[in-house]
Amino acid sequence: KIGAKKQFVVPNNLADKLVLNYDQKVPEFDLRNNWKSTSGNPLFNKPLQFRFFKDVESLHDNQLYFLPIIEFRNIYDGLNLGMNINNKGVLNKPFLFGISPVYSVNSNALTGFAKVGYNTYFEDQNLCNINFGMAITHSSFAENAFVTKTVPYVNFNFRDATNLRSNELKSLSFRYVGIEKDFVEVKDDEAVAPPYKVFNIRYIDANNSFKKYHKWFLDAQFSDDFGKLSFNYEIRRRSNKDQFYNLRVYAGAFLYSKIPSGEQNFDFALDRPTDYLFDYNYLGQFESTGSFSQQLIIAEGGFKSKLDTAFANEWLTSLNASASIWKYVQVYGDIGLLKNKGNNPLFVYDA
C-alpha cells in the first residue's frame, strides 16, 4: 500500500525515460507529469516541438506555440506586425513564458513584451493559486516617445473551495513597477522624464455573475515621492427586461507627497487618469485635443465630462451611476468632492 510518499529504486537499464501509466489503464485528467527523462535536465525533459496556434498538448513533447500578430494598440505605434511565442497550452502548467516582438509601423520601432511566471496550484483549500514572475513591455505613449515598464510581481488567488461553481474570486497582489521614459523630441512632461518606481499592493474581491456583478478593491502605492491609498466599489444589476443599473463609489487620498507644485502626473484624476503606471489601454494617451483625447476609461473619478478642475493632489471622492435605456444607450450621472493643497474642497457633478 502506497501512502502519501514512497521511494522506488529503478534499475539503470539504459532507459532514456520513465513513464507512469504508460498504457493509460488508470483514469487520469492530467498525464503530462507522468514522464521523466533520465538525462537529468529539467528544461529538456521532453523533446521540443514547434506549432502554430494553441493546440491540445502532446504527452511526448514540450511544445512552443507561434501566433502571428497583426494588431493596433495606439495611434503612435500604429499597426503592429510580429509574432507571439509562448508555451501556454489548454491546461494549466507551472512554468509559463511568452515573448512578443513586433514592428510598429508608425513609430518605425521594435516594441512588444516579454513575460515569465511560475504557478503553484492548491486543491481543497481557499488559496487556490500562487503565481510570481516578471513582465517587461516597451511601447510608444506619445509621438517619438517610448516607455519601458518592468514589473516583478507575486499574486495570491483565492476562491471558495466548497463551491467551485461560484464566480467569486479574491486576490492579493504585490508588484514593483519600474517606469523609464525615452523622449526623443517631446519637450512636455519634463518633470517625470527621469525613471520612477512604485510599489503597489492591491486586494480585489469580485463576483463576475452576469446578473449580480460586484467588485471592490483596496489599493496602496508607495514611491520615494508619494504614497496613495484608494478604494473602489462597483455593483451592477440586470433587470428582467434586460436593463442594467450600475453604481460605483471611489475614494482616494495621498498619505504623503513630495511632488513639486504644479506637477499633475501623479494626481488623482476626475475624468481622465494620467496612467503613470501605464495600466490602461489608451489609444492616444498624450492627446489633449481631438477624438482620442475623449476616450472614456472608468477609473479614479470616473467622470464623463471635462471640468475646469480635473485633478486633486490631496484627496478625491466620487459617485458614478448609470442605467441602460435601450441596448447601448445609457443615462449617467456623476458627483464628486475633491481637495487640492491650499484650496477648499470643491463639489463637482455632471450628467
Language-model features, listed with the residues they occupy:
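Noncatalytic modules at the cell exterior or secretory-pathway interfaces
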Residues: 12-16
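Residue-level detector of the transmembrane beta-barrel scaffold of outer-membrane proteins
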Residues: 17-19, 65-67, 96-98, 129-135, ...
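Transmembrane beta-strands of outer-membrane beta-barrel pores
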Residues: 70-76, 87-89, 101-107, 118-120, ...
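Outer-membrane beta-barrel translocator domains and adjoining extracellular loop/strand segments
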Residues: 111-114, 143-149, 167, 182-190, ...
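C-terminal outer-membrane beta-barrel translocator/porin domains of Gram-negative envelope proteins
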Residues: 131-144, 155, 198-324
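A charged, amphipathic interaction segment
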Residues: 149-171
